[in-house]
């Protein structure tokens, strides 16, 4: 126990006290900095290093001495229908921000995470509260993987190595992550800046802005870019927000790349606001993101899988439903899937 506490506190101390990046780079886009990247909207400043440190310390102690759990309904999904599907656009919620998206015969994974923990160590850190909704072995052939950022709940070493070894997909990542993947032996990678696009197997995938931050160690805070993604096929468009706070750029995304048939938007990890508001949306803000990007429907992600914040674990969809009713939106416009559930979109 002492070893576990010491290791985790050391990791979190490094993360909480991490240094930022340098000044703007002359002639470069506004989010580029010397040595890394920055948000262009300063309306949600990040908490101080000390505030972050004390929060994460409290989370570590709570996880050790008072771990929380929640049992959420799941759908048994053996993947057979997904492996046979070549025609219908579908989306399957594996858990957290991991989606299997099928569009025009192409299989896309977002932020794949199949590990028991979202952590740099196997014996501590946020543990998975519910099993992945689709077993890794049940996946159809994966053609494309998109990564939104380098945090442990979105970029998992074991999962991406396993995908590269068994499925050989094309990885599309924000700036700075290609080199990190190359160190793992993963080389079929293209890294993109905000608003860059690539055509893969007939789909157009665009890297879009997000309001967040990055870093896996003491030394690399904001050294790699963070983003969302859009996926456009012959007749359907999907928006994947990644991990983000609410800010005004979503309206521009909707104008430039929308409308979207489905918008996958995070609804969890929003309390306490002094820590979380700079990088995460509340359920209420998530619905505003859907409206801003001109989404026909919203799919709730980033909740019910890892215990990352202080809100009750089952609260995010409850708040989402109350806000949907307040806005007068039709129930079918807001999807809260069970782990493993597949829907056509």
Can you say where each PLM-predicted feature lies in the sequence?
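Bacterial N-terminal signal peptides
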Residues: 6-15
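Active-site HxH/HxHxD metal-binding segment of metal-dependent hydrolases
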Residues: 115-122, 133-197, 208-209, 214
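Cap/insert and terminal regions of metallo-dependent hydrolase folds
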Residues: 18-44, 135, 144, 151, ...
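Metallo-beta-lactamase
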Residues: 14-138, 173-242, 261-268, 319-344, ...
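Acidic/histidine-rich helix-loop elements
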Residues: 112-131, 213-220, 271-280, 307
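Catalytic core of the metallo-beta-lactamase
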Residues: 98-102, 199-261, 277, 281-285
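Positively charged n-region of N-terminal signal peptides that target proteins for export
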Residues: 1-4
């Amino acid at each position: 126990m002492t070893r576990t506490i010491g290791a985790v506190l050391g990791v979190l101390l490094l993360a909480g006290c991490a240094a930022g990046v340098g000044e703007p780079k002359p002639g470069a886009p506004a989010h580029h900095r010397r040595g890394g990247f920055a948000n262009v909207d300063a309306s949600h400043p990040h908490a101080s290093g000390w505030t972050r440190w004390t929060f994460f310390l409290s989370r570590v102690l709570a996880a050790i001495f008072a771990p929380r759990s929640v049992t959420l309904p799941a759908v048994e999904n053996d993947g057979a229908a997904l492996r046979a599907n070549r025609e219908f656009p579908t989306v399957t919620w594996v858990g957290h921000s991991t989606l299997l998206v099928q569009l025009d015969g192409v299989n896309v994974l977002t932020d794949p995470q199949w590990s028991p923990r979202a952590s740099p160590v196997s014996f501590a850190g946020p543990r998975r509260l519910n099993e992945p909704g689709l077993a890794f072995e049940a996946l159809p052939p994966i053609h494309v993987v998109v990564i939104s950022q380098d945090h442990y709940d979105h970029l998992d070493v074991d999962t991406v190595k396993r995908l590269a070894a068994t499925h050989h997909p094309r990885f599309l990542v924000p700036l700075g992550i290609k080199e990190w993947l190359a160190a793992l032996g993963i080389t079929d990678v293209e890294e993109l800046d905000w608003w860059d696009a690539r055509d893969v197997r007939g789909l157009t995938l665009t890297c879009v802005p997000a309001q967040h931050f990055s870093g896996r160690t003491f030394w690399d805070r904001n050294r790699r870019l963070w983003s969302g993604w859009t996926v456009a096929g012959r007749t359907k468009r999907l928006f994947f927000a990644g991990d983000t706070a609410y800010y005004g750029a979503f309206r521009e995304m909707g104008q430039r790349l929308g409308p979207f048939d489905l918008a996958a938007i995070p609804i969890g990890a929003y309390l306490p606001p002094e820590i979380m508001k700079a990088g995460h949306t509340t359920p209420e803000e998530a619905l505003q993101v859907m409206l801003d990007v001109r989404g026909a429907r919203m799919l709730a992600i980033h909740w019910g899988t890892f215990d990352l914040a202080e809100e009750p674990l089952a609260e995010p969809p409850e708040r989402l439903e109350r806000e949907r009713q307040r806005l007068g939106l039709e129930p079918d416009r807001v999807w809260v899937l069970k782990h493993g559930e597949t829907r056509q979109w």
